[in-house]
């Protein structure tokens, strides 16, 4: 079974893509990372930083998660991210996404030993 940490990497990590020229990025990535298997996932964020830099966020600023849990952490610095948002005219399994790049602080939930990101909570 895929671990929570591995699932986070599959769903949210894309360190190699520092600049995305293609408006098709989300359509391709959401499919290749299996995020459209049983439905069109409405929103997903990819982080274009090294895994080590994202894992380090677990030891940065502790903040409350959206669900009220206390194991979320906000990055000290802004990170290069891409937001993928379902466009509203998807016809599953043909999911259509809008690709938006941003530089924002990320908030992740962490757990386990080693203490690593298991959930992408927000970007601010």
From Swiss-Prot:
EC main group: lyase
Subcellular location: Secreted
Disulfide bonds: 26-84, 40-95, 58-110, 65-72
Active site: 12, 119
Catalytic activity reported: an [RNA] containing cytidine + H2O = an [RNA]-3'-cytidine-3'-phosphate + a 5'-hydroxy-ribonucleotide-3'-[RNA]; an [RNA] containing uridine + H2O = an [RNA]-3'-uridine-3'-phosphate + a 5'-hydroxy-ribonucleotide-3'-[RNA]
Keywords, comma-separated and alphabetical: Disulfide bond, Endonuclease, Glycoprotein, Hydrolase, Lyase, Nuclease, Secreted
Ranges in coiled-coil conformation: none
Xref: InterPro entries: RNaseA, RNaseA-like_dom_sf, RNaseA_AS, RNaseA_domain
Gene3D superfamilies: Ribonuclease A-like domain
Name of protein: Ribonuclease pancreatic
Organism: Alces alces alces
Lineage per the UniProt record: Eukaryota, Metazoa, Chordata, Craniata, Vertebrata
Gene: RNASE1
